[in-house]
Amino acid sequence: MANPNIVNVTSIVGGNLGFNLSNTLTATLLTVDSDKILKINRITVANVDGSSAANVDLFVDGLTTAGATGITPTGADATVYLAKTVSVPADATLVIADTPIYLMEGDILKGGASASGDLDLFLSYEVLDDA
């Protein structure tokens, strides 16, 4: 698994995705394809339940622990949480990320909610392709 060179991208395609989170806390939401980098610009979670709070878990699995050219990580982890058991009040919205996060080919975004159907996750992204 190589890191795509973002200087030589052949296309940049933006988009949005929405998920109604299940109570399977390790559900796969997306996997980054080969020769792609996913730039996540924003992640929000809205609690659509009018009376009860719900917790959200969101993490990236499959991260490379080898680093990239010019970086030698020490103690890098292949699984990292962006949010872990974070409470989202009823009828409220939580911003999980509002600055860019890059996911590389093979990285997997996973997550879920403490109550099935209570949380909607929205993300805005760009796919950078060097194929």
Predicted features and spans:
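Beta-sandwich interaction modules
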Residues: 91-106
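A short beta-strand element within beta-rich, extracytoplasmic domains
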Residues: 38-47, 108-111
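Beta-strand elements of well-folded, non-transmembrane domains
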Residues: 47, 62-64, 125-129
